[in-house]
Amino acid sequence: MALDKSVILLPLLVLVLLVLGCLGRESRAKKFQRQHMDSGSSPSSNSTYCNQMMKRRSMTQGRCKPVNTFVHEPLVDVQNVCFQEKVTCKNGQTNCFKSKSSMHITDCRLTNGSRYPNCAYRTSPKERRIIVACEGSPYVPVHFDASVEDST
């Protein structure tokens, strides 16, 4: 009798643990938003912007992320890039798209000699076209691939 219950309860326990694990995991779209979206602010020439944002957005935990870009445009405008000019991603995949117009961004680059846990970044505000990888349903940005100067 006790063995019958354990045979039934064990698979149920495994299923519950799998579901709970998935619920706690950040989706690729949410990770993109956390790492790259800063819609509520303008590009800042404040030299501490990147140091503050990289720490606030959990990109200096365990290591210093070497490069990151924040986009200062409404999320819907960045999501719309997924339906603009299709381009090849840096890694050769074909799910990247380039914005049709320039966007306000801030590039953050780890300064030479900076080491974890004292991550220090150079802040560079720019206006550039962005290239993002998109996937899912709905089709949304999941990876920031690059930024390029507007050729027009």
From Swiss-Prot:
Q: What class of enzyme is it?
A: lyase
Single GO molecular-function term? nucleic acid binding
Q: Which reaction does it catalyse?
A: an [RNA] containing cytidine + H2O = an [RNA]-3'-cytidine-3'-phosphate + a 5'-hydroxy-ribonucleotide-3'-[RNA]; an [RNA] containing uridine + H2O = an [RNA]-3'-uridine-3'-phosphate + a 5'-hydroxy-ribonucleotide-3'-[RNA]
**Binding residues for substrate, per the UniProt record?**
31, 34, 65-69, 90, 109
* E.C. number(s) listed in UniProt: 4.6.1.18
UniProt KW keywords: Disulfide bond, Endonuclease, Glycoprotein, Hydrolase, Lyase, Nuclease, Secreted, Signal
At which residues is glycosylation annotated?
Answer: 46, 112
Grouped into one coarse class, the protein's main location is: secreted
As recorded in UniProt, coiled-coil segments are none
Localization recorded for this chain is: Secreted
Source organism superkingdom: Eukaryota
List cystine links.
50-108, 64-119, 82-134, 89-96
Per the record, the GO terms for biological process are:
defense response to Gram-positive bacterium
Signal peptide as annotated in the record: 1-24
Q: Name one GO cellular component term.
A: extracellular region
Which residues are annotated as active site? Answer: 36, 143
Name the protein family: Belongs to the pancreatic ribonuclease family.
Briefly, what is this protein's role? Endonuclease that catalyzes the cleavage of RNA on the 3' side of pyrimidine nucleotides. Acts on single-stranded and double-stranded RNA.
Q: Can you state the subunit structure given in the record? A: Monomer. Interacts with and forms tight 1:1 complexes with RNH1. Dimerization of two such complexes may occur. Interaction with RNH1 inhibits this protein.
What name goes with this protein? Ribonuclease pancreatic
Q: Which organism is it from?
A: Chlorocebus aethiops
